[in-house]
Amino acid sequence: MASPIDDKMSPAERRAGVSLAAIFALRMLGLFLILPVFAVHAHGMPGGDNAAMVGMAIGAYGLTQAFLQIPFGTASDRFGRKPVIVFGLVLFVIGSVVAAMAQDVQMVIVGRVIQGAGAISAAVTALAADLTRDQHRTKIMAMIGSSIGLVFAISMVAAPLLYALIGMSGLFWLTAVLAVAAIFTVMFVVPAAPPVPRAIGRFSEVLGNGQLMRLNFGVFALHLMQTAMWVLVPAGLVRAGLPMVEHWKVYLPAVLLSFVVMVPAIIMAEKKGAMKRVFNSAIILLLLVQVGMYVEGGAGMWPLAILLTLFFVAFNVLEATQPSWISRVAPPHAKGTALGIYNTLQSIGLFLGGALGGWLVQNVGPGSVSLLGGGLAVVWLILASGMVAPATRRVAAA
């Protein structure tokens, strides 16, 4: 039997981390493959000349997710994680098929709305927390976060090539197939989930917890900044002389280099009891990136590449540490609910980042997007300074 101070993950924990990261990766790869090519493809579809409709087709997924993260998270507390995850993935498959068969932008929007109805992020994250001990939870969250970053980089490279081979309809069909693979992973690869304690009246417990609400603001700000960045970065790279089809040459190294920095940061946060120090340092780095984006103004490729790499470092550290922190602070019987609220704020941030970022660029100017991001980072840093890092309970593997 492992000792109580054993820092090695058990085989069951490693299996849980790899399989849950695979579920996120399969689902997110299907989503990310659409992003680099849909706006161009939509010009050839009925309704594609309406920029607002095209934007809605891209953003409708996040909007539906925002409404359903809490119900799915709460349902996973009541009925178990796996049944809720499978149900959500089935909805995602249906939405992908609807979008694949769409003949106009309006039907693509319908498909994207149904895709977003499969809001499983909270349930998957809660299951990851259920299946891991405290001292390894941030590592598991880092595995999940890294898988998302990696498939994002892969999608930036693969999407134009796959689009040329199978078209937009083929990409949506591929998305459906990937989601089916995720369903089989949930059913046959993910370890059995422990029983979920059931309780009533826990929603107010979560909303009344100041620590949780600070983390909820943090994920809202983080993903608003992330989506708004993509309003600026592609256009900045084009202005710097890099054609759209070659943007992956910046994105892929930036993501991979960020992982090299992120992993030691996560290990230090776990082993050295430096969670709050690493957390606040990542927020400060986000603030510096926003200042750099404002000062640099998209004038050169190398400054943009460096800023993007630094952004991914901060983003990946925060993306790994925040869900782990939530799962430790939340009442044990309400982890699904707490993570549902957390993922709702994440989805709202994703939606507003694109919508507000685009509006600001159109009506105020590109610099206003960086000012907004910098302001959010300052508020977040102030809120985070009042947080107390959760204690890590070191327990032996079963």
Q: Model regions: which residues?
A:
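C-terminal membrane-cytosol helix-exit motif in multi-pass small-molecule transporters
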Residues: 176-195, 383-388
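Conserved MFS/SLC helix-loop-helix module at the cytosolic interface between two early adjacent transmembrane helices
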Residues: 67-103
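Juxtamembrane intracellular "pre-TM" segments in multi-pass secondary transporters
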Residues: 2-14, 190-221
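Cytoplasmic helix-loop-helix junction between adjacent transmembrane helices
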Residues: 111-149
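Intracellular juxtamembrane helix-capping segments at the cytosolic ends
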Residues: 120-132, 317-330
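Helix-to-loop junctions at the C-terminal end of transmembrane segments
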Residues: 68-79, 260-274, 361
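Cytoplasmic membrane-interface "Motif A"-like loop-to-helix N-cap segments
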Residues: 78-88, 270-284
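C-terminal transmembrane helical hairpin of 12-TM major facilitator-type secondary transporters
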Residues: 276-322
